[in-house]
C-alpha cells in the first residue's frame, strides 16, 4: 500500500510523462461529461478524441495509447461500440478503463459489464496497470 506522499509522487510523474509524450487516450463517454473529459485530458497535456461508432472505437484504440469507456449515457450503438473497443484494447495490450456509471439501471449496462467479465475470464489475461 502506498502512502499519500508516494501517491503524490506517482501523480506528478504521470503528468510529466503525459506532457512529454502527448498521448492519445480516446474516449467513448457520455454526453453529460464529454466536454469535461476532453478538457481534463487536454489540461494535463494529453490528446483527446471522442467517438460513438464501433469501427471508430477500434480505430481510436489502434491509433492511441489507451481508451476510457463511460457508461453514463448509453445509446443503442454502444452495445457494439463498448465491447469492440474494450476487446481491441485488450487484444493490443493497451490500458483501458471502464467507468460503469449507473450499473444495474436497465439491462444494457449490466449486459455490457457481464460480457466483458466473461470475455476476460475466457482470455485468462490480466490488464497492465496504467504506466507500465
Language model: regions and residue ranges:
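Glycine-rich phosphate/adenosyl-contacting loop at the front of the ribokinase-like
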Residues: 1-50
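Glycine-rich phosphate/dinucleotide-binding loop and adjoining beta-alpha-beta core of small-molecule
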Residues: 58-132
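Short acidic loop-to-helix transition motifs that present clustered carboxylates
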Residues: 52-57
Amino acid at each position: 500500500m502506498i502512502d499519500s506522499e508516494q501517491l503524490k509522487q506517482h501523480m506528478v510523474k504521470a503528468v510529466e510523462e503525459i506532457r512529454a509524450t502527448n498521448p492519445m487516450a480516446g474516449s467513448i463517454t457520455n454526453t453529460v461529461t464529454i466536454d469535461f473529459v476532453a478538457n481534463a485530458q487536454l489540461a494535463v497535456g494529453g490528446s483527446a478524441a471522442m467517438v460513438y461508432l464501433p469501427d471508430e472505437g477500434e480505430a481510436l484504440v489502434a491509433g492511441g495509447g489507451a481508451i476510457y469507456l463511460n457508461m453514463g449515457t448509453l445509446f443503442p450503438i454502444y452495445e457494439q461500440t463498448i465491447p469492440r473497443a474494450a476487446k481491441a484494447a485488450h487484444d493490443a495490450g493497451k490500458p483501458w478503463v471502464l467507468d460503469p456509471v449507473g450499473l444495474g439501471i436497465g439491462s444494457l449496462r449490466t449486459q455490457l459489464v457481464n460480457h466483458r467479465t466473461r470475455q476476460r475470464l475466457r482470455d485468462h489475461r490480466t490488464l497492465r496497470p496504467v504506466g507500465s
